[in-house]
Amino acid sequence: MDTKKDIKSLNLEELKTEMESMGEKAFRAKQMYEWMHVKLVRSFDEMTNLSAKFREQCKEKYEYTCVNPVRIQESKIDGTKKFLFELSDGNVVESVWMQYKHGNSVCISSQVGCRMGCKFCASTLDGLERNLTPSEMLDQIYAITRLTGERVSNVVVMGTGEPMDNYNLSLIHISEPTRRS
């Protein structure tokens, strides 16, 4: 069985190449990119300006990740919110949303678990399970944006895991939100 490509982890140029390989015009990539990274939809079904047939083809060929909130805790002191998100494989990661005068910051996870072994950190207790994909990192930001109704202005990669141990994927994640500004 072929593994489906993770469509949200593709940049715009890669998405154009994928669309052309499916016999679609290059503009289709921009439409999909906007649905995923600007409108923040949770599935192909929400991409209503794309034909039902094309959306079905996409479902067959591509994985469309989406994190689901398991628990949300809010500080009574400053309104900071801590999110526990379930990934598509059942693993969970934490993210935090913080409001400041200069804007809203989110702290996201880059791994499930951690291999660093820091004595002060609970993330390392079970070791490293796996790196998050760029789309799973983006999904944390997108879910928080949808759940709070607020725009995110700053992203910190300091949740579960060591971002430098997932460096290449973290760089991909960091570049995507800046493209959609």
Name each region found by the language model.
Residues D165:
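Hydrophobic/aromatic residue at the end of a short beta strand that borders the catalytic acidic motif
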Residues M32, C114, V155:
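Residue-level signal for inorganic ion chemistry
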Residues Q99-E136:
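Canonical Radical SAM [4Fe-4S] cluster-binding loop centered on the CxxxCxxC motif
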Residues M1-N104:
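Flexible, acidic/Gly-rich N-terminal and inter-domain linker regions that tether
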Residues T124-N154:
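Conserved alpha-helical substructure of the radical SAM core
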Residues M158-G161:
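Glycine-rich beta-strand-to-loop/alpha-helix junction loops that act as flexible
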Residues I172-S181:
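Single conserved hydrophobic/aromatic residue that forms the stacking wall/gate
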